[in-house]
A protein has these predicted regions:
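Active-site-proximal loop/helix segment associated with metal-binding centers of metalloenzymes
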Residues: 119-177
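Short, flexible active-site-adjacent loop segments at beta-strand->alpha-helix junctions, enriched
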Residues: 83, 104, 113, 118-121, ...
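Short, well-ordered, mixed-charge alpha-helical segments that flank or form enzyme active sites
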Residues: 86-90, 116-117, 123-126
Length: 190
């Protein structure tokens, strides 16, 4: 069985809300693990994640431990970065055994080719502000400047502020992505 989750935004909200969200997510991972061949985490698992060479965000102990436990048990965990956790480095792969993808991928699942993407940077050609922000935030130069000029405490404070601003700006509680044209639409759309 294949399981998919996205936009959990671990760490968002107040401390009590963030802990409740994490506990629910870990319970979901436990449930999925009963018969999972693979678990696909399709972006924005974390509300903000930035890795320094030797520093990762504080918290998420239950989630990180659970991901490591799942991969230790032979369950494939595939992590796609989203617009809130695009600065994931190698920590999750190295310490938790998670596969990391920073761009859309195609997988063969149950005999079908399945295209998987977070979608934050899809179909933004006609939206110059989003295209600009996407380019800026994915810039290696900005990542380097961020990591060398900002103390981790300040970087996390800024990241959580920006993330909350971004998350709240849309006003949506659910998303349906339907802009695929008939000639682009695969047989099965997940």
């Amino acid at each position: 069985m294949y399981y998919f989750a996205s936009d959990i935004h671990l760490g968002a909200g107040g401390e009590a809300f963030a802990q409740q969200t994490e506990r629910r997510f870990v319970r979901w991972l436990d449930d999925a693990a009963q018969d999972a061949e693979a678990i696909f985490l399709v972006g924005d698992v974390f509300d903000f994640w930035f890795e320094y060479r030797g520093v990762v965000p504080k918290g998420f102990v239950r989630t990180l431990g659970k991901l490591a436990e799942l991969t230790d048990r032979g369950i494939r965990v595939v992590f796609f970065t989203g617009n809130h956790d695009m600065w994931v480095g190698d920590y999750l792969a190295r310490e938790c055994g998670v596969e990391i993808y920073t761009s859309p991928q195609q997988f063969r699942l149950n005999g079908k080719n399945v295209f998987i993407a977070h979608g934050d940077n899809m179909n933004i050609d006609g939206q110059p502000v989003l295209k600009f922000l996407n380019t800026v935030f994915r810039s290696r130069t900005l990542r380097w400047l961020f990591s060398w000029l900002l103390h981790p405490d300040l970087a996390m404070r800024f990241g959580h502020w920006w993330s909350g601003k971004s998350r709240k700006s849309h006003g949506a509680e659910a998303v349906s992505y339907t802009h695929l044209r008939a000639h682009e639409t695969p047989e099965h759309l997940v």
